[in-house]
């Protein structure tokens, strides 16, 4: 079956893996998913990611990050904002701040996928893909 929204699929896999306290999770490989994983790694929400598999079966392996003895997930919430049925765009002046700057909005811009902080520095707006905090 074809996946109509691979970004939502990625975020759901991350959310489910965090709830079950898994160390890693597998996500189908795409350029967009790789870019989102890179932003999550740069912002400190995941330890690392790598590519595995061959051909059509290639996927990303994300190492999730936890803190403390009780393994509290670093990613507390992941919300999809712009969806295939309703795209949400923002200009550089109206870039959202998630939880007063504690969270991250992941933005797809003309200069690539980046966090809201990087988009402010670059002075670009774009499609708001998701919020992570």
Swiss-Prot record:
Biological process GO terms, please?
translation
Q: Which UniProt keywords apply?
A: Ribonucleoprotein, Ribosomal protein, RNA-binding, rRNA-binding
GO CC field: ribonucleoprotein complex; ribosome
Q: Which SUPFAM superfamilies does its entry note? A: Ribosomal protein S8
- InterPro entries the UniProt entry points to: Ribosomal_uS8 (IPR000630), Ribosomal_uS8_CS (IPR047863), Ribosomal_uS8_sf (IPR035987)
| A molecular function GO annotation | structural constituent of ribosome
Q: What does this protein do?
A: One of the primary rRNA binding proteins, it binds directly to 16S rRNA central domain where it helps coordinate assembly of the platform of the 30S subunit.
Q: What is this protein called?
A: Small ribosomal subunit protein uS8
Species per Swiss-Prot/TrEMBL record: Synechococcus sp. (strain RCC307)
